[in-house]
Amino acid sequence: MMQRCLRLQKPLALRRGLHLAQVNSQAVATEAPEAEPLDAFERQYLKERIEISPFQRLFLGTGSSIAALLNPRRHDMIACLGETTGEDALWTILDTMQASEEGQRIMADKPRIHTSTIDFKYLETLPPDTFGAAYVKFLKDNQVTPDSRMAVRFLEDPKLAYLMTRYRECHDLIHTVLDMPTNMLGEVAVKWVEALNTGLPMCYGGAVFGAVRLRPKQRRAYLKHYLPWALENGKRAKPLMPVYWEKRWEQNIHELRSELGITVLNKA
């Protein structure tokens, strides 16, 4: 509790330093008074993370941004960009998680979204108007899998690493609740909602530069319908990171959208 109060009250740089000092102390097995014990995810992440200097972080951030701009299909570069530019936004997201009972449960449980952790056979038995059924339909219609997300490697703090992991693994769930496909137009619209909802710089970059690559017909639809809808939902929706999606499978998807302040776009 004391650590949580410190993080909420101290400036960003100071609270980050306090937490990283605790993490590093535990990583070398030295005594760290008042430090929270590391859980399984955090211990494993500290073994696998790649430590980089501030210069290397700047170099990777710049290089990955250029590579992602030239080729938006370079998911490895997009992932690198997210990790090297998103730390401040992730600290803010962590505060949002800790301010919500549902978010606190997520941070305690650290659930993962994979075919090995989600009972998709069960989701297929749910009524079609439930969130779980809509998620399965989204995966099938767009021919995507939850197992395709890249592992986080460059963030120092394991809690922030989990939040970035959570963001990546929940991306398709955001598509589902927004009723957006995975084509370029749908991805750009979702990125705007995610950018305004999370503050992650990579989401803003994906939204702005992704729109540049739209074809003329797509761009007209984007400017007339998709962009206004995305901006409205991004500003109005409740924080999406603290939503424990795995506990919402049986919930009526229309009720879920209403609870979160989300409206779907009429694509007709």
From Swiss-Prot:
Enzyme class: lyase
Record's catalysed reaction(s): a 4-hydroxy-3-methoxy-5-(all-trans-polyprenyl)benzoate + H(+) = a 2-methoxy-6-(all-trans-polyprenyl)phenol + CO2
Claim: Metal-binding is one of the keywords in the record: yes
InterPro entries in alphabetical order: Coq4, Coq4_euk
EC number of this enzyme: 4.1.1.130
Location within or outside the cell: Mitochondrion inner membrane
Function of the protein: Lyase that catalyzes the C1-decarboxylation of 4-hydroxy-3-methoxy-5-(all-trans-polyprenyl)benzoic acid into 2-methoxy-6-(all-trans-polyprenyl)phenol during ubiquinone biosynthesis.
HAMAP family in UniProt: Coq4
Protein's name in the database: Ubiquinone biosynthesis protein COQ4 homolog, mitochondrial
